[in-house]
Amino acid sequence: MNYQRGLDTWVGTILGTFCALLLVVAQGEASESRQYTEEFHQTYPLTAGGRVELDNINGAVHITAWDRNEVKVDAVKYAGSKQRLDEARIEVEAGGNFVSVRTKYPDHNHTFNGGWNDPAGVEYTLSVPRGARLDEIKLINGPLDIHGVTAEVRASCINGKMLADGLQGRVKLSAINGRMEARFERLSDSPVELSSVNGGIALTLPSDAKAELEASTVSGGIDDDFGLHVRHHRFVGNDLRGELGGGGTRILLSNVNGRIEVRHANDGHAISPAKDLNHDDRDDRDEDDDEI
């Protein structure tokens, strides 16, 4: 038991230190000065079920669903100097069934050996059709939030908090350093995958969810409201595997250094019965205790 606890602590410390260094580097190299700003406002038509992409390096991203077949892009560039402001460009490609938004910088700002010299940031606010597919939303430094998109959502964030709510379709979210929260209004037949390296994962499901759920951590606990059994491994890690409401949507949760929380919504529905799919009800660490 003492060895297990010590190894967990060691792994968590190493990973936490590494990710904290990434955080310091990102914050130190990215401009937060808003001495110079420039606004961008454009609207683009998008067919039903069309695809939306966004690639941003530094700056918050807010995406909200609305009931129009068009994408509205509102952005604010900000920098500590006019030169850095002018270097950052907002590029948009639109083709009727897709809208792609990217922040572009000169090549020298993309290197680690003399680049990243206080680049400008861009804060985006996108209004997208409720049924649009968020095919690739990528952010390096800054918070990311997505509200009310009912179709596919694929998003990643390296350094910053991630929040997605009102989810209904296929979802794949990944984070390196920062807390992740995903809240489902309902589940479809499409899979759900949430992964993180350093930071907690909080998943909220409908109370009457029908799902097959798997969750695992290297260093960090697992909590769930549905009563599924969490297995604690001999040296490192915890895992959970079970069915809710007889099974359904495939849900995979993985975290290296941080907790996983599975909650049910306070929606007034009866809570789905849970069935544990881990055949061994005993913890690996309990077996260690028997051997001592």
Each language-model region and where it sits:
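Intrinsically disordered, low-complexity terminal regions
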Residues: 2-292
